[in-house]
Amino acid sequence: MQKLKQQVFEANMDLPRYGLVTFTWGNVSAIDRERGLVVIKPSGVAYETMKADDMVVVDMSGKVVEGAYRPSSDTATHLELYRRCPSLGGIVHTHSTHATAWAQAGLAIPALGTTHADYFFGDIPCTRGLSEEEVQGEYELNTGKVIIETLGNAEPLHTPGIVVYQHGPFAWGKDAHDAVHNAVVMEEVAKMAWIARGINPQLNHIDSFLMNKHFMRKHGPNAYYGQK
């Protein structure tokens, strides 16, 4: 697990490097599917002092199997997403400014241009609000459940992120570094959408044919973006 702990540590350290977190407002995890184990950031540990050995290993029930610290308070959310979405290898949660602003406004981040379409096939959805019962009960687990509910039948890697109403963004990918990459993109397109709608409040969504072209040339069966 040492290699995965190092990867998760590096991915967590990318969050302040890319300006996605303030203080300890974020966490990254990754899963070893063969072993059924998840590595996640410890709860409340400052990035300035954190080390790879501080990463916490939990099983799929959330039981700590390795590590001196308590795991992130959002662990149950991560675990629910891993259980329900077999294609996910890494998950990120932040309170990055612009994506969180859309979450607090209760609005999906609209697909307005090709930067968005290169990564997200359509709007980045916003979940419904959790009920008082859901919050007072198993809050973090129910956060994961409302994310799954909002995704519906969508392929998670075609919509590699979501904003949770009144909370903030979650992003994911094939591994921890891919998840962070998608979290960075989500924050950037959230900022772009906010600026663009400020310039033109009547701005329409990107044309569907342009959306399809940009997403499929990177992620479709006949993708040709980048090097093989």
Curated annotation (Swiss-Prot):
Which residues are named in the active-site annotation? 118, 225
Question: What functional role does this protein have?
Answer: Catalyzes the isomerization of L-ribulose 5-phosphate to D-xylulose 5-phosphate. Is involved in the anaerobic L-ascorbate utilization.
Q: What is its EC number?
A: 5.1.3.4
- Do you know which HAMAP family this protein is assigned to? UlaF (MF_01952)
The top of its lineage is: Bacteria, Pseudomonadati, Pseudomonadota, Gammaproteobacteria, Enterobacterales
Name the catalysed reactions: L-ribulose 5-phosphate = D-xylulose 5-phosphate
GO biological process terms, alphabetically, are: L-ascorbic acid catabolic process; pentose catabolic process
Identify the domain of life: Bacteria
Q: Which family does it belong to?
A: Belongs to the aldolase class II family. AraD/FucA subfamily.
- This protein is called L-ribulose-5-phosphate 4-epimerase UlaF
Zinc as a keyword?
Answer: yes
Q: Where does substrate bind?
A: 26-27, 43-44, 72-73
Q: Where does Zn(2+) bind?
A: 74, 93, 95, 167
Q: Which cofactor does it need?
A: Zn(2+)
Per its UniProt record, what SUPFAM superfamilies does this chain match?
A: AraD/HMP-PK domain-like
